A protein has these predicted regions:
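Bacterial Sec-dependent N-terminal signal peptides
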Residues: 1-23
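Cell-envelope and extracellular/periplasmic
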Residues: 21-146
Length: 146
């Protein structure tokens, strides 16, 4: 009975390990997500992780080229994406390995501004912008993202 139990456990472990290796992981850092904005007319570093030496295909919808890269021994891949001039069009970036893929949707290309400074970021519109209550209902520009 004891040998039978060990055989079942060993078979289960072997099968689960083989299954886990058959589905390669694919992940991106959280800064690459739906509704993001990329800087126009620039080379943007784009990276992620998968199994070591796995071929990764990156397909930005603004270009006609598929970028092919191979993950290194530490399971990391990195490319530079050439972005087009600004536009009102929503793009997507497809990242594919074997039978798995990730799609980043609603990507805008435009100007990316980085706001910093403790006192600057603490300031809000109630502290000195004239007519803020009249202007806020009309502030509905979907092309500005925070």
């Amino acid at each position: 009975m004891r040998n039978y139990l060990y055989t079942i456990i060993f078979a289960w472990l072997f099968c689960s390990q083989a299954y886990a290796q058959s589905i390669p992981p694919l992940s991106l850092p959280s800064i690459f997500s739906d509704h993001m904005v990329l800087q126009q007319n620039s080379k943007v570093k784009f990276w992620g992780w998968t199994n070591p030496r796995t071929t990764v295909r990156i397909i930005p919808s603004w270009g006609q080229d598929t970028i092919i890269v191979k993950a290194d021994n530490r399971a990391r891949f990195e490319v530079e994406l050439q972005t087009p001039p600004t536009s009102k069009k929503n793009y997507q970036i497809e990242v594919k390995i074997k039978d798995r893929d990730l799609i980043i949707k609603d990507v805008l290309i435009g100007e990316v501004w980085l706001c910093s400074g403790q006192s600057n970021m603490e300031w809000n519109s109630a502290k000195g912008i004239q007519d803020v209550k009249d202007e806020l209902p009309h502030a509905n520009n979907s092309e500005i993202r925070f």
